[in-house]
Amino acid sequence: MATTLRDILDKLLGRQPASAKTARERLQLVLAHDRSDLSPELLDQMRREIFEVVAKYVEIDIEGGDVSLETEDRMTALVANLPIKRSQAKAVSNQAKAVSNQEKAVSSQEKVSNSQESVSTPEAME
């Protein structure tokens, strides 16, 4: 969408957009939903799942995030705007190290347990 000089002046002067322009934007939104054949419930479910997946990797601002359908040049797109607070790469890395250390500890305990079982007792030799 190209911004015209009139749009810029209207924004600077605090003028409300023309009702025809507002109606057109609303119609485009309705058409985008119709073309995608997605119900509002399905779109909301997709939004929640997208947030959950992204939150596994980065800390996001859920309140500031938005998932919407946009149409431009007869093409409908699902657009996710998810403000990132910070990367969780360090947290994920630390968690992976902790799991690895736990696995090593369990493995060591199993080796000790197995070696103790294989040691023969004096009664078994008689």
UniProtKB/Swiss-Prot annotation:
Keyword presence, Plastid: no
GO biological process, one term: regulation of division septum assembly
Source domain of life: Bacteria
Protein keywords: Cell cycle, Cell division
Xref: SUPFAM superfamilies: Cell division protein MinE topological specificity domain (SSF55229)
Cross-referenced InterPro entries: MinE (IPR005527), MinE_sf (IPR036707)
Gene3D superfamilies for this protein: Cell division topological specificity factor MinE (3.30.1070.10)
Region of interest called Disordered, as start-end residue ranges on this chain: 92-126
UniProt record similarity statement: Belongs to the MinE family.
Biological function: Prevents the cell division inhibition by proteins MinC and MinD at internal division sites while permitting inhibition at polar sites. This ensures cell division at the proper site by restricting the formation of a division septum at the midpoint of the long axis of the cell.
The protein, known as: Cell division topological specificity factor
Source organism per UniProt: Prochlorococcus marinus (strain MIT 9303)
UniProt gene name: minE
